[in-house]
Amino acid sequence: APNDDCSNPVVINGTGLFPFDTTTATTGAEGQAETLCYAFGTSNVHNDVWFEWTSPTTDTYSVETCGFTSLDSKISVHAGTGCPTAGSSIGCNDDNCGLQSAVWFSATAGSTYTIQLGAFSATGSGTGNMNIYPIILPPNDNCATPDVIAGTGTFNFDNTLASTGLEGQNEALCYDFGTSAVQNDIWFVWTSDFTGSGRVTTCTGQTID
């Protein structure tokens, strides 16, 4: 693949669908040890290709393969140009929509970002399209702007368009099934109206995992 190496990315701009082909790509050394990419026992992005994208606006953007490939994909985004240094990923995702990926991150108009797209499996490769578009986040997507709730009862939530923030992603108590990440998270501040033990649950009436 011509953009198999991070030193020779395909330059793209704007929003929409951008084709990719990893069928002849190899697994480079760069972008392979990112904490944000760790899922299901590995942080590797196999058989990866690279893109250099300039944001047209200051917004939260999604870079995703949902609905546009059969590849079990993995995507990582790095700020700036050139081959990324270790620990520089600002967003990474393996399975957001089935086996496909979606990374949401804050972009600044005129700034350039390096996108790494590959496979979860060492033997995975394929073709498809990468979709880039701005999204409107829920008001409590950021921990700085939580929904304020109090007392007991049922409180509605909707994380359909929520992004995965950096905060609260490496908690030892959250580690399960190979990851401690809380994907597509939203935030609440709750004031208790009682003294004693309480329980927070989504056990009834929800289909989200």
Where are these regions (language model features)?
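Acidic, Ser/Thr/Pro-rich low-complexity intrinsically disordered segments
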Residues: N8, N13-G14, T24-P138, T145, ...
